[in-house]
Amino acid sequence: MRKTSTIIFRLLLWGLLAALPQVAFPQLDAKTLMQAQRNGINNPLYGNNPYENGEDEENLPPNPADTAKEKRIRKPLESYFFNDSIRALNNFLWTISRDYNRVKIEPLDTTLQDWRIDYPFYRKGVGDIALGPLGQASMPTDYFERPRYENFSFSQAYDAYTYNLENVPFYNVKKPYLQMTYLESGQKKFREEQFGLTVAHNISPSTGFNINYKARGTRGQYDRSRTKNHNLEVAFSHTGKRYSIHAAYINNHIEQEENGGVVGEWAIVDTTFEMPSGVPMRLASAEAENIFRNNAFFVEQSYGIPLLPVTESDFSIAHLPAVYIGHTFEYNSWSKIYSDIRSTYVDDRGSRDENGNFVPTEHSFYKNWYINPLQSRDSIYERIISNRFFVQAQPWNRNGVVGTLNGGVGLDLHTYSQFAMDTYLTGEYRKTKKTGFYVYGSIDGKIRRYVDWGADFRLYPSGYRSGDLSVGANLALSAKVKGHPLILEGRFRMERRSPSFWDENLFSNHFVWFTPLSKETDTRFEVTFRVPDYALEVGAKQGVVTDKIYYGADALITQAPGAVSLTSVYARKDFRIGGLHLDHRVLLQWSSDQEVIPVPLASAFLSYYYEFWVVRNVLRLQIGADCRYNTNYYSPGYNPALSAFYNQREVRTGNYPYTDLFVTGKWKRMRIFLKYQHINKGLWGNGEYFSTARYPLNPGMFKIGLSWGFYD
């Protein structure tokens, strides 16, 4: 009897073991499974081991098969957001759309490309109009790349540094991911420092969390140029087969001492100081400072309802007709405190006498002192609470001719706080509340691999910003010639938008206005042609702005009647001859009214370097130089009390090649760089190294950086 039971038990056990492979891979046929196992992949739907492939990792031999024990196979990533090529990546990140149930895949920052560019505002296009030191305000040189904040426009100048609801990254990693970065430069007394930490971990293939923290700042080469920026982002995501959720908390803290720029260009061009801190600044004795605080939280959820039965062979519902319903909640608050004390500065070359000799002149930086004639402490606050409900229809499949039809409604609750004349003495804030209601929608699709198209709109039918409208469309055509992809893209966007609250209402010690403004209309056309395999990109943009709102020559809010047109042509071509890289980015811009939209005629970023293996698959180096340049024009000025750029008409800047010499390397997972910034100071150029009027860029200094990634 005992022998019979033993035989039956063994037969049942063998049958169970024989059935295990079929249970583990219900979606794979035998041929696919054998090919995957031959390539050392335990589960091809979950991707490769990050240590087995790629330049970034060690090429370790696969582990020998364990015939004694079968490994438990994890459920693969089944989200409709990601296609097979994305799932196969070892690590990837994405951002989520605030309005639509869509994600955008972004590259991980683990390569040598652009690693040497330590200022974040220099990483795109031809660069930015910047005050100089790390952590201070900047604005893209390319007019079409400049952000326009509808809410709390005072933080717009720090867009390159801050986390916001549009750029929060979410990660999917096969192994726990940790990356640490540290960069420093200059003497201890004037040091610039950057520290970055990224931690990402997946609890399951579909569920993960990540933390990003950045601390950037400088003690300042020039007097009163200390900055301190802290940016924290904590995010959680679950991208399941039907249900997905993205949630994140953001904290941005910015402190910037304000020096007002040099008393005169002569202090940089014609005078040599023993230390940069000796250069006379216009607000050096005013103790001026800006402090920004931002707290934000959002959660976006969606649930997919397939319209056809889901079988075991359906890896995701991306290829099935489906309807998705979702909701987005946002909380976002910003505050700004500007403080200073009344003081004057002396320009030793302010004027000339009848004999042509310089005569010192005394000036006051601010013309008006409305509240307190001795000191300022301007405090403003803005909060927005937003709810969106959306529906997304997927008629056939997510990448079909009509991929998705989207529609939604949103409700925004705005609160604005600032002092008023009748409440300033009591210390009470005056609060203004507004409610905005809007509807929006879009449609997009794909015709095989050759055509991508889409259109969208947003309309405010009532409430705050009533009548605002945004309409856009895009079309991308793809083809291959001898195996090389060619991409032609066209975009159109028309926006009719109300002025922001602060454009019409501001009460502070130096600026007061309560002026209703008309809606601004901005129409743009864009065409781009790209050949990725040959590192070639050319494009043209045309814009027409009617009733443009801007800060005029006196830094007061201004609205230009009529239309202003702006045309730009952009070209990028990277040449490679063996290990020699010759990278070029050139931008040409024409404005019909330079007093309203001032832009340089030509701007360029050139990078020439040689890249080679020191030790094959172990250590790779780049040695070269970067140069930024723009033609002479009336560059924007910067006003500390507003934290905004304005269209000054007194000083022209440009015609200066700002050049850096660098050596970067990657040793396995560690990246390093050595750089001498502004190596041409005093050697070539006209000596006018200004990007913003009266704000000199940093003088020459040595930098060193280290970034180390851990994937286990």
Regions found by a protein language model. Give the residues of each.
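Membrane-proximal, glycine/serine-rich, low-complexity loop/turn segments characteristic
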Residues: 27-295, 304-318, 478-486, 694-699, ...
